[in-house]
Amino acid sequence: MEYSKRIQDKIVDSGKTIIQTMKLMDDGFTKSLIVFNNGRFVGIITNGDLQRAIIAKIPFDTPILKVVDNKTKRYASVTDDREKIKTWMLEKRAELMPILDEEGNLSDVIFWKDLFSDDKIEDNRKKIDLPVVIMAGGKGTRLNPLTNVIPKPLVPVGEKTILEVIMDQFEGIGCHKFYMSVNYKADMVKYYLSQLEHKYDIEFFQEDKPLGTIGSVSLLKGRITTPFFVSNCDSINEQDYRDVYDYHVSNHNDLTIVTMVKSFKIPYGVIETGEDGLMVALSEKPELTYQVNTGVYILNPSCIEEIPKGEFFHITDLMEKTKTRGGRVGCFPVSEHAWKDMGEWREYLKLIKVL
């Protein structure tokens, strides 16, 4: 059957792998694709399906046919009226809705913008009011010479600063209380925030010497009694952090790391050798996939007790300490295009060019 271009652009073959499908979603700026197998409709695959597969340690090169989960999906039939379909799409916040005929074949697809005037999918999810700790005290040396003049939190991104973009994202999901660790050019950061028309609920705390990537959080002992977010001041994610919190709670984690799925293609043939230098295997221009740390976390309040007061202590030290005592450190993956590292010149320039 011939489909319109906008439907064809959303179709992915069931033989595509998890990592290939993540890239297709990134390139198409979409979180849902329509899966076909040998010309027949199989189902919808979402970004959330791929994230759950990665969390479950399903290999990145697994075909998505093994990942499609129709038990959690709802599809419309040609006999359903538009008001019913509209209600379903609102309930699921669905980007698109397949319309199936009596034999289960794809007849049409209704997109969000076909039914709603606002292109932005309505957010009817429950808000979460968790504390947010922002690590804003670093020197931002990777952005020199700009950060010789202004601190990294105040580096502009469009009409806002990096700091405002990060805080606005958390406020958007219901978080209102911010604890901000400051050190380098602290007075400038405080003054700027005090002059904003929008007043954030911020408590500042300041280390009197460098304490590593998490050491200053020891100063918050006794002040935070619920799970809380920690964010570096250069990490912008397009991920809804409520999904991360849901995973953190359901997986009974002590600490959850938001990771980014990153692929590296080696432009050479890679040779594996054994004893006496004999070749064991050859991979021609292999693509390697890893999860890398984005600098955003959820911590249980008990983690604060693990951070030694007044000592230099990295978040990686906290991860190891938590694991050593038998705690759970989880990883929640986001796609490569979902994360922007604003602390690195190339990524920063790429973003402001888009804006």
Please tell me what each predicted stretch does.
Residues 1-10, 16-17, 62-73, 147-150, ...:
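Bateman (tandem CBS) regulatory domains
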Residues 124-189, 352:
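N-terminal glycine-rich phosphate-binding loop and ensuing alpha1 helix
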Residues 10-29, 36-37, 54, 74-94, ...:
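The conserved cystathionine-beta-synthase
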Residues 251-261:
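A short, conserved acidic/glycine-rich loop-to-beta-strand motif
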Residues 228-229, 236, 242-249, 262-265, ...:
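Catalytic-core segments of class I nucleotidyltransferases/pyrophosphorylases
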Residues 55, 160-233, 243, 273, ...:
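Conserved N-terminal catalytic core of the sugar/cofactor nucleotidyltransferase
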